Amino acid sequence: MKTAFRQQLPRLTGGYDHYLEFGVDTRTQQAFWLSRQVLSRPWHDAAQRRLTVSLCQPSGPSAVLLQDTDARSAYPSLPMCWTEEQYNSPSGSFLSSEDDQLQGRIFTASSMATWRLRASSPVEPESILWPSGGLRCQPTQWLGELDASGHSISGLFVGTRIQFWGRIAPIGMALLSVPRLGGDAQVQLTAMGQFAGRAGALSERLNGSVGVLRVGHETYHFDRWWPAGALASARLDAYRWMATLFSATHRLELVADGGNPRITPWQGLVDHTPEGLRQLLRVTAYATIHVRLFARGSDAPLQEWRNESAFLMTLAGDTPNLPLGPVATP
């Protein structure tokens, strides 16, 4: 399990490698997500690392989000595997990830966060590759506690490990993961879509979507990543994603809706691209989703699922003005 989540940062062309872990307590619906990202610019040996932690709940105070950043002057200082990472920054923040023991601390100017978690997974990771990058995912459970800005959550969290990487940051993107699709612990879905333009007709035609669906002991790889606008259109905005994914034998239709941001807890995370641009990622752990599985060429669904708590991250390319810090209004 350790060797599967290896660093994938391109050395010559530059790019990004994003490793994300999230979990939801099925009893209280409290959730956390922990993001670790490495960026490098073309033909530069230096790399920038970002560590972000968030706690959220479906009602009451929506969320806490903290971030720390540091720079590495050479690639040899980066870990070979995400699951064996050691992170230390001048601010005093640190992270230790080894032997499925995950612990760390973030210091910022106004607050701090600490966490101690133990991870376990009954299945091996699955990967999908395309010419400019790839996606890797693994259903995982965490047992432990997290504390941020005086807010504490603890228990057994059910979620996913996700890694995605590439040479060029997409203008539009959606990342979706459901650890218990339809409330069934034997069904998990992780999917990703990338758009070549802002929301609109051009973006809908120039999009590619991939995903991994586990149903019991059977795994479906929807790996037809090339733009498929002639077969089925996709829709992406700040809070919703609709797409059709294809494999050689099946297709998957999904509609993910994060709802009204005034009601559903959303977070806005100011992110950076390898090219030095700034963008806004919107994240919620409480999106609703409707999924249907078809045989290729058939209009009769083989199976159908609905879920009220899915992890959804969107990048809609509509953020002309962003604050200086990591947190923004979603």
Model-derived regions: residue spans:
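Structured soluble/peripheral alpha/beta segments that form catalytic or ligand/cofactor-binding pockets
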Residues: 1-330
